[in-house]
Structure formats: structure tokens, C-alpha cells
Amino acid sequence: MFELAVNFPIHNEEKSIIGVLNEWIFELDKLKIDYCLVISEDGSNDKTKSVLSRFMLNNKRVIDNMVEEKRGYTGATISGIKVADAKYILCVDSDGQCDPSDFVKFWNKRFEISDSVMIGNRKNRKDTNLRLLCSKFFGIFHYLMFPNKIKDPSCPYVLFEKKLIKNIDIYLNYVDEAFWWLFVAACVKKKIKIYQMDINHRERFIGMTQVYKLHKFPIIFIKNFLGLIKLKLAN
């Protein structure tokens, strides 16, 4: 068993993913952690798979969690958590916006988060205005259904002990896109304490953050809203 598994849900990141992974390797090696990187590739239709396959040939700390079909962000994230053979799980996005240099702050607090979760709070968030507006709008409904003091419930920079997931895993597939909103809501529902840590939020390494087309937002919002209602009504 590894001490730490870093789970990367990856989709269409052929030009940037190796730089992202190498940045994390550099920081984790400095901390002398027994770690692995879980490559939860999610049915990319560019050259991401072949780029990652070459990378894995030269790195024994990489866990291959690649599939042909697209599982979606939620499916890829949950799958990566399940295959990770480690005491601690860190989940981060794979676009370079999560700064590896922030991780030492999380790791130094790991003994304080037994049976709890530590989530990042993105300072000066580098996302589009539309994405920020959607987060604020959905955040209102999230808070009304699951009151909490978390400043950034959708932040994809989350550390927890793997054993904790058994308390909430039955709820985690209730939404397709808004995984971390649901994760935080499930923790609130099960009275799992959540700690927050300010983190740096960077521009993407390459390309633009995926934002759904405007005409798709109503159905996406409704689906995720219904997922939160389902969680609210669940035992």
C-alpha cells in the first residue's frame, strides 16, 4: 500500500498532461512520500492516451486507470479513488490549475484530518466569468439544501483518508458533472468535518477551461439540482 495516491481525471489534455504530471512528481519527490499517480483517463478523443501510455512505460509510480469509453468526470474520479491502494487520496484536476506547491500545506495537516476532509479554497480563481457566475448561482441552492461554511465547495483539490469514502460512496454517482458539490454535500449530510485551506489557482497550462454551451446549462443545472435533491432525501 502506498502512503498517498494522487488521482487525476484526464480528458483531452494531450499537450499539457505530461508537464502537469512531472510538476507533481517533482513536488512529491521533495517531500519523500511513498506515492502513486492514478491516471484516470476518461475516453479522450485526441492523443492523450498514447501520450500517457509512453509516459507510464518510464514511471513505476503510475497506476493505469485508462478506459476506452467516456465515463464522465464523476465516473473517472470515483474509479480512480477505488483503484488507489493508498492510505491517503488526493484528488486534483489535470489541467495545471491546481498548484502542486500548495500540497505541502495539506500534507503537514494530514494527522489532523482523520475521519475528515481537507478541501482547497481557490484564491483569485482563474476561471471565465461564465464559470464563476454558474458557481455562484449553483452555490446558492447548494447552501440552502446543505448549509455549511465551505467557501469553495466545487474546488478540485481534496485530501482525505481512503477509508472515509465508504461512508459516502453510495451517494457519489447521483450527479454527472458537479462531483465536488455532491461530495461536499454528502460529507455535510453524514456530519463529516471539512477543513479548508487557501490555495493558489492558476491559468490552465494550455487551452481553455471547458465550459458548456449556454443552451445546455438549463438541463445540466436541472440534472445536478435533482442529484442534490436525491441526496437530501436519501437515508
Q: What are the residue ranges of the model-derived segments?
A:
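Cell-envelope/extracellular polymer assembly enzymes that use nucleotide-activated donors
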Residues: 3-5, 36, 182
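Short hydrophobic beta-strand elements that form part
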Residues: 5-8, 38-39, 66
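Donor nucleotide-sugar binding loop of glycosyltransferases
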Residues: 13-16, 44, 73
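Conserved donor nucleotide-binding strand/loop of the catalytic core
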Residues: 35, 49-83
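A conserved acidic beta->alpha catalytic loop
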Residues: 41-50, 96
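Acceptor/aglycone-binding surface of glycosyltransferases and processive sugar-polymer synthases
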Residues: 68-83, 88-91, 100-177, 204-225
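Catalytic donor-sugar/metal-binding loop of nucleotide-sugar-dependent glycosyltransferases
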Residues: 175, 184-202
